[in-house]
């Protein structure tokens, strides 16, 4: 009986830690530029797609270059956003196979799913405005007036189309019948929606001035999205305050509820995760930790990049680094600036 109990416990653990295939499509970032994407059979050569995404590729071939670009943006933006953290998103480069930091329902996995969902919709919305996607153009002009001295013009980012097509592609793996545990599906669908909510909230009015001698008597305005790096920073804030959840029966169905705060439901605006993460101090590829040995740290910082936090109390080593920068700049009439290149030595620090 004890053996059966342990086996059941182990299988339950696997069901709740194995991820569905939600972010394997990030492997598209490795697609060679030489690969043509002008015929449906080319979809078979794309890495990381599940069958439903493959079908979307065949029926929406014109979107695939944009989606490939989105995968590259996710990787670049994630690494940039976490450059000051112990977990620095470097394992995202392993797509379509990952270590446990992204293979399990972790806080890190929550962030990457949210960013991926936001990025694909963001990239498609922007591609519509630049004319890169046939059959999709600028967003419609809003019905309400922008206000006195303002007028609608320019080319607004087509957010509605971006979310429509982006969610079809990025959510497709989680909606497959055989794609991991129900708990993981619910978690990743929730976090993907949080990413899209942050994207929607980033839509803002942007304007250009018109008038005699730059008087700006009239402003032409449109609605545009913030840069993906700004959206990533908003999601990073949510990552830091993410809520741990459990898959628990409520009524006739199971739902994700906060593990420690059973009196309230999961908030639609917060990232959620099922499995706690390690501290990422020491290298352990089995759990997806690259460690912080030889990571650069900031001796004077009080943040996550400080040498105390980044190095996990192991201490740090100084080294001297040469920096070349512009200096002795002069303005010449009219109208250009010339500078010289100066070299200086700065002290930097890496973790022991």
UniProtKB/Swiss-Prot annotation:
Any one GO cellular component localisation term in the record: extracellular region
Q: Which InterPro entries match?
A: Wnt (IPR005817), Wnt_C (IPR043158), Wnt_CS (IPR018161)
Q: Which residues are glycosylated?
A: 38, 88, 298
Which is one GO molecular function term here?
cytokine activity
PTM characteristics: Glycosylation is required for protein secretion. Palmitoleoylation is required for efficient binding to frizzled receptors. Depalmitoleoylation leads to Wnt signaling pathway inhibition.
What is the predominant subcellular site recorded for this chain?
Answer: secreted
Q: Which domain of life is it from?
A: Eukaryota
Subcellular location field: Secreted, Extracellular space, Extracellular matrix
Lipid anchor (O-palmitoleoyl serine) at which residues? 213
One GO biological-process annotation of the entry reads: cell fate commitment
PTM sites of type Sulfotyrosine: 273, 280
Signal sequence annotation: 1-22
Cysteine-cysteine disulfides: 78-89, 128-136, 138-155, 207-221, 209-216, 281-312, 297-307, 311-351, 327-342, 329-339, 334-335
Please indicate if the UniProt record lists Protein biosynthesis as a keyword: no
Per its UniProt record, what PROSITE patterns does this chain match?
WNT1
Q: Per UniProt, which keywords does this protein have?
A: Developmental protein, Disulfide bond, Extracellular matrix, Gastrulation, Glycoprotein, Lipoprotein, Secreted, Signal, Sulfation, Wnt signaling pathway
Query: Which tissues is this chain's protein expressed in?
Result: In embryos, expressed in the neural tube, dorsal somite, mesenchymal cells within the dorsal fin, branchial arches and heart muscle, becoming expressed throughout the myocardium by the tadpole stage (stage 45). Prior to neural crest cell migration, expressed in a domain flanking the neural crest on the medial or neural (the opposite side to wnt11b). Weakly expressed in the developing pronephros from stage 25, with expression increasing from stages 30 to 35.
Give the family this protein belongs to, as stated in its UniProt record: Belongs to the Wnt family.
Q: What else does the entry mention about this protein?
A: Xenopus and other lower vertebrates contain duplicated wnt11 genes resulting from an ancient gene duplication event, but the second copy has since been lost in mammals. This gene was originally called wnt11r. but was renamed to wnt11 to reflect its orthology.
Q: What does this protein do?
A: Ligand for members of the frizzled family of seven transmembrane receptors. Shares much functionality with wnt11b. Signals through a non-canonical Wnt pathway to activate Jun-N-terminal kinase (JNK) to regulate gastrulation movements. Acts in a non-cell-autonomous manner to control neural crest migration, probably acting as an extracellular signal from surrounding tissue, but is not required for neural crest induction. Acts redundantly with wnt11b during pronephros induction. Regulates cardiac morphogenesis through the activation of JNK, but is not required for cardiac differentiation.
Q: What is this protein called?
A: Protein Wnt-11
Taxonomy, top ranks, is: Eukaryota, Metazoa, Chordata, Craniata, Vertebrata
Instruction: Name the gene.
Output: wnt11
């Amino acid at each position: 009986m004890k053996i059966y109990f342990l086996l059941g416990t182990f299988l339950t653990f696997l069901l709740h830690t194995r991820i569905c295939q939600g972010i394997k499509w990030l492997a598209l970032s490795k697609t060679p530029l030489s690969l043509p994407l002008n015929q449906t059979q080319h979809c078979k050569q794309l890495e990381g797609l599940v069958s439903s995404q493959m079908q979307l590729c065949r029926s929406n071939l014109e979107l695939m270059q944009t989606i490939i670009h989105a995968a590259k943006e996710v990787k670049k933006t994630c690494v940039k956003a976490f450059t000051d953290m112990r977990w620095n998103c470097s394992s995202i480069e392993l797509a379509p196979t990952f270590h446990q930091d992204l293979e399990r329902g972790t806080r890190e996995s929550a962030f990457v799913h949210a960013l991926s969902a936001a990025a694909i919709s963001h990239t498609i919305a922007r591609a519509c405005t630049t004319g890169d996607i046939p059959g999709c153009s600028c967003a419609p002009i809003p019905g309400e007036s922008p206000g006195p001295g303002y007028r609608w013009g320019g080319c607004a980012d087509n957010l509605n189309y971006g979310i429509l097509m982006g969610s079809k592609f990025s959510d497709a793996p989680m909606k497959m019948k055989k794609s991991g545990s129900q708990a993981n599906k619910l978690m990743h669908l929730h976090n993907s929606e949080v990413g899209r909510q942050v994207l929607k909230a980033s839509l803002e009015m942007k304007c250009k001035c018109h008038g005699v001698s730059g008087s700006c008597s009239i402003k032409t305005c449109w609605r545009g999205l913030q840069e993906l790096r700004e959206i990533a920073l908003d999601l990073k804030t949510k990552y830091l305050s993410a809520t741990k959840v459990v898959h628990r029966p409520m009524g006739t169905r199971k739902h994700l509820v906060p593990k420690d705060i059973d009196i309230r439901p999961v908030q639609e605006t917060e990232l959620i995760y099922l499995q706690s993460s390690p501290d990422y101090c020491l290298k352990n590829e089995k759990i997806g930790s690259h460690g912080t040995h030889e990571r650069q740290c900031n001796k004077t910082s009080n943040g996550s990049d400080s040498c105390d936090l980044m190095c996990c109390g192991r201490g740090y080593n100084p080294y001297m680094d040469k920096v070349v920068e512009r200096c002795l700049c002069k303005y010449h009439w009219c109208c250009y600036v010339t500078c010289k290149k100066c070299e200086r030595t700065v002290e930097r620090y890496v973790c022991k």
